[in-house]
């Protein structure tokens, strides 16, 4: 009997919840990215939504990449979000490195033209062994490039750039006189601050928040 009562109570609680539509930010099209149940609008705030980048851009070559959004508020049953980062799946990175011989990791905080800060993590994989001098030159060139690029763009434009198609060709161009690299990926980005508002560097829910993964 106790089990039946608990089950009934759970069903009643579920019925009391409302379906909310979660949208990407305006700078990524204000697209409906998922739906989720919530007790009220306040219960939705700070939840994190994970979305395949291919769903946002239509580029299915990016099926290994996920964007992360944090819900900032709701208007009725529509939830608004901000972009807080993205990442490439670890399995893809491991396969990438296994097929080649050298890996270089670059991590840099980039400040955009409107004062936002985002941590950018780049992975470089070469087909052959690199000298320490070459590695240093590649790191320096890519760090200089991504910092300069970010400083020229607003946060919204830089987000579109990070998950778009142009970054790869631009990074290859930035290093072509050092070594003919064939694989350079922005493997992860993490929002540090946006318009003076501090954001957690880890892609985890804030206290009381809940992660939502899109199926």
Swiss-Prot record:
Keywords: Ribonucleoprotein, Ribosomal protein
GO terms for biological process, alphabetical: translation
Secretion signal, residue range per the UniProt entry: none
Alphabetized Pfam families for the sequence: Ribosomal_S3Ae
Transmembrane parts of this sequence: none
Region feature (Disordered): 195-215
GO cellular component: ribonucleoprotein complex; ribosome
Molecular function terms, GO-annotated: structural constituent of ribosome
Family from the record: Belongs to the eukaryotic ribosomal protein eS1 family.
HAMAP family: Ribosomal_eS1
NCBIfam families for this protein: PRK04057.1
Protein name (Swiss-Prot/TrEMBL): Small ribosomal subunit protein eS1
Organism encoding this protein: Thermoplasma acidophilum (strain ATCC 25905 / DSM 1728 / JCM 9062 / NBRC 15155 / AMRC-C165)
Name of the gene: rps3ae
